[in-house]
């Protein structure tokens, strides 16, 4: 079920998975709307005006290809197919070319918003056959959420699989953001001794400032939620986090494109280790009497807020750097400022600071690492002492904060003008003759040393 508002256009729905779903939908939630339901695919296609626009909401993978093959015989040249699932961007690029050969226009549209977005409007990231954009723009922008200034959270991303790539990076940032919030909760609880009620109020207060976001807002709600017997539900949820794969895809693509993506990789790895519940319980038992906490300096809630904000900036810096690298690699010409604006509403990572991020990219010519933008570098400098203090405290307390630590180490590496990679390159040349550049030579000129002969 997707957004069912009072559209000016007619809508036809068809379900090929479970018989009767379309009928129940039309008679239920869609009652009174301009929506027709069909169980026969040929009748469904025949009911649409040309050029036909069909949006497919199916599981990523073979199901998309199968549906394309099923519906294509009933379509005509110039008809549009939109894949609104979480497809791999490489698959989308392949489908764009295959559909073009059939005379069809294929669009891969990343959609973020969850169940709420399905009813109230989502952030929609379309890409693929550019000729389809004038045809589908009114429909998708009507379906999309609207930012506070009324701008639809939907615009054209680029050719091939650009739309699904942007959605994949969105999900990677989402993984990072959620892990940072979880570590904040864990640190406040384990090292700070703050109960759920106080923590809920704290997140609620943060949601009134620069951390204002959907994820911070719902965290406040979750921490305050009690069951009928007065117990907090969050304390009764098993500490095992699931995932659907887009976070892993983003890390894999960052590796392939040579981008630093450590914070988001740690977020994925933490979900992985969370599933090893029995192993963790056994390890906790084995080491319980041996893990001694060191004396530590206390931290304030304000210092934790600074740590969360600075680390959040790193998550976005890594995500947008990956978008920038992909744009250059694939010739997509992604508009990073526009992407930031498009994520201001509907999507899971919507947050107040995206307006500032969009303005920073516009001022910076649309490229650059956001950690270097004046709008954010001043805030990072101010947060740095607290950031270091909070991470050090967590280490001394034995509280796992891998995303916070990764973010801080990324910052330290980014701001170090000479890293120990010179030794790594020397080792590579020693055992594999992989050559090296010299500090007293030209960039791009490589040397090899016969290390053994010098001994």
Positions of predicted regions on the chain:
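Conserved N-terminal Rossmann-fold NAD(P) cofactor-binding segment
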Residues: 9-53, 57-75, 94-102, 390
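C-terminal amphipathic alpha-helical interaction region
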Residues: 381, 386-455
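Single conserved hydrophobic/aromatic residue that forms the stacking wall/gate
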Residues: 1-7, 11
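Rossmann-fold dinucleotide-binding core
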Residues: 64-69, 82-83, 87-200, 208-236, ...
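Small-residue-rich helix-loop
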Residues: 205-206, 328-362
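Interdomain hinge/lid region at the active-site interface
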Residues: 164, 189, 194-197, 201, ...
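Glycine-centered, small-residue-biased loops immediately flanking beta-strands
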Residues: 79
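Hydrophobic beta-strand scaffold residues
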Residues: 12, 37, 105-107, 261, ...
